């Protein structure tokens, strides 16, 4: 090797592979108000130190790669790199840690959940040095929140639009979810709405199939809404699912819904994607439509305790991307949801300021700086006997959605809707009178059933129905 070549090698950058923790593990770092903070549940491979695992997460989800590159010298890594600033062992687990990572705000495009997730939950989840990785929570700084529109309208504006106050809203998913013709589908909608429900809903997998094209469904559902409104004197709605194969087709369906004059449309935000969801949310804000969000596919992402992403993160992302309702579990029905954890992310959806509370899975204090709230939807295996618990757990600002619990009534859809409305009104009145629904709920329902034959029939049908499985969504 010539002396000239040796000189260049000695003054050049130090090529090769070095431990991530030398650059990305910084326990002395003081987080900034503008940082996005993440709490990851990290399970390192055997022999990988926790500091190296946490640093690898910070590196691979920000500026790092597997080897040193000369272009590191063309930027300021100290300004742009993610930092693992704290590690704590998970109680009861041998080799599992909560790694806290801080990301500088400049790493993310303004107003883009898509870009935020591409970095934070991107390729790092396939990293070989980690046996498993789960994103438990995010702290979104106020400076980043202010770059998002958020929900098209929010809870208070929705109540004003519907002129409904002081109680939860009632909904129903039309069943069978697939196979009905548009006219029969519209008939089912009408029967439910005239019986006393506020909303009916397209199932998440109803889009535009051969047995029922979307335009036909929209027209017959609009007819059902107007007829039910005329008969009851109440504002009614049906969640018309605008989810489609392209953003252009999705917006076309939303435009047609607006032209029909209906109050609300629907989107499957995970299968449709965050870019499509934000696009639709902006359209709904500009055109006065409420937006109902279904979370189909969420359990693929959030149900495994050690890998993936907790639903509280998906809930925060939805509030940023935009939606007025989102399904959030029931605690008491057939779908997943442990009480304190569910109420933790329900608060993250509805409230403006949420304190850190590890007992409910909330790792960071979150300030939404007046971004409108999202109404949680309780849906899945619920019926009239659950009404006291649901009213007690969720309070007024929620949608209680009974699909089979309405349509399965032995006398038909309208009596099923009557039963649910009577049960709800009885529970709200009892609560307002100071009665303890958790203790006296069954008695409240029995008393109401004495003067409502529809409720009495529903109570008889579902008196033995329970879904007693242990939740896997635990701390």
UniProtKB/Swiss-Prot annotation:
Subcellular location: Plastid, Chloroplast
Catalytic activity: 2 (2R)-3-phosphoglycerate + 2 H(+) = D-ribulose 1,5-bisphosphate + CO2 + H2O; D-ribulose 1,5-bisphosphate + O2 = 2-phosphoglycolate + (2R)-3-phosphoglycerate + 2 H(+)
EC class name: lyase
Chain positions with N-acetylproline modification: 3
Domain of life, per lineage: Eukaryota
PTM-bearing positions, type N6-carboxylysine: 201
Post-translational changes noted in the entry: The disulfide bond which can form in the large chain dimeric partners within the hexadecamer appears to be associated with oxidative stress and protein turnover.
Gene Ontology CC annotation, any one: chloroplast
UniProt GO MF annotations: magnesium ion binding; monooxygenase activity; ribulose-bisphosphate carboxylase activity
Chain positions recorded as substrate binding sites: 123, 173, 177, 295, 327, 379
Site (Transition state stabilizer) location in chain: 334
Binding site for Mg(2+): 201, 203-204
Family matches, as SUPFAM superfamilies: RuBisCo, C-terminal domain, RuBisCO, large subunit, small (N-terminal) domain
One GO process term, biological-process aspect: photorespiration
Other comment: The basic functional RuBisCO is composed of a large chain homodimer in a 'head-to-tail' conformation. In form I RuBisCO this homodimer is arranged in a barrel-like tetramer with the small subunits forming a tetrameric 'cap' on each end of the 'barrel'.
Family as reported in the entry's similarity comment: Belongs to the RuBisCO large chain family. Type I subfamily.
Name of the featured protein: Ribulose bisphosphate carboxylase large chain
Organism: Welwitschia mirabilis
Originating gene: rbcL
């Amino acid at each position: 090797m010539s002396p000239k070549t040796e000189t260049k090698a000695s003054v050049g950058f130090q090529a090769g592979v070095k431990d991530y923790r030398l650059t990305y593990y910084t326990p002395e770092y003081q987080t900034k108000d503008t940082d996005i903070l993440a709490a990851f549940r990290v399970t390192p491979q055997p022999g990988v130190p926790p500091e190296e695992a946490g640093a690898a997460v910070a590196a691979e989800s920000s500026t790092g790669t597997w080897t040193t590159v000369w272009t590191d010298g063309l930027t300021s890594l100290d300004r742009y790199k993610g930092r693992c600033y704290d590690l704590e062992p998970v109680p009861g687990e041998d080799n599992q840690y909560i790694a806290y990572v801080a990301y500088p705000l400049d790493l993310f495009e303004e107003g883009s959940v898509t870009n935020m997730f591409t970095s934070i939950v991107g390729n790092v989840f396939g990293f070989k040095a980690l046996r498993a990785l789960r994103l438990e929570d995010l702290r979104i700084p106020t400076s980043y929140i202010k770059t998002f529109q958020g929900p098209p309208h929010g809870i208070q504006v929705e109540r004003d639009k519907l002129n409904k106050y002081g109680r939860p809203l009632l909904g129903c998913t039309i069943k069978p979810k697939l196979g009905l013709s548009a006219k029969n589908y519209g008939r089912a909608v009408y029967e439910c709405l005239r019986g006393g429900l506020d909303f009916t809903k397209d199932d998440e997998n109803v889009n535009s199939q051969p047995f029922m094209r979307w335009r036909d469904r929209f027209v017959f559902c609009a007819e059902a809404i107007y007829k039910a409104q005329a008969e009851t004197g109440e504002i009614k709605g049906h969640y018309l699912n605008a989810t489609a194969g392209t953003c252009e087709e999705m917006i076309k369906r939303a435009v047609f819904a607006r032209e029909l004059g209906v109050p609300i449309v629907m989107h499957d935000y995970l299968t449709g994607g965050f870019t499509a969801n934000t696009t639709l949310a902006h359209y709904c804000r500009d055109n006065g439509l409420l937006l109902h969000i279904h979370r189909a596919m969420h359990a693929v992402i959030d149900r495994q305790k050690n890998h993936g992403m907790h639903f509280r993160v998906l809930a925060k992302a939805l509030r940023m991307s935009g939606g007025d309702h989102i399904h959030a579990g029931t605690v008491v029905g057939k779908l997943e949801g442990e009480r304190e954890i569910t109420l933790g992310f329900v608060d993250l959806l509805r409230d403006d300021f949420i304190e850190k509370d590890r007992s409910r899975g909330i790792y960071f204090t979150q300030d939404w700086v007046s971004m409108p709230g999202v109404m949680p939807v309780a849906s899945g295996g619920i019926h009239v006997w659950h009404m006291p618990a649901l009213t007690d757990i969720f309070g007024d600002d929620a949608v209680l959605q009974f699909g089979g619990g309405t349509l399965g009534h032995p006398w038909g859809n309208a009596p099923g809707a009557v039963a649910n409305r009577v049960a709800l009104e009885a529970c709200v009145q009892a609560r307002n009178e100071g009665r303890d629904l958790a203790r006296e709920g069954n008695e409240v329902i029995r008393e109401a059933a004495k003067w409502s034959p529809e409720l009495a029939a529903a109570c008889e049908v579902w008196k033995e129905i329970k879904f007693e499985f242990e939740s896997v969504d635990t701390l």
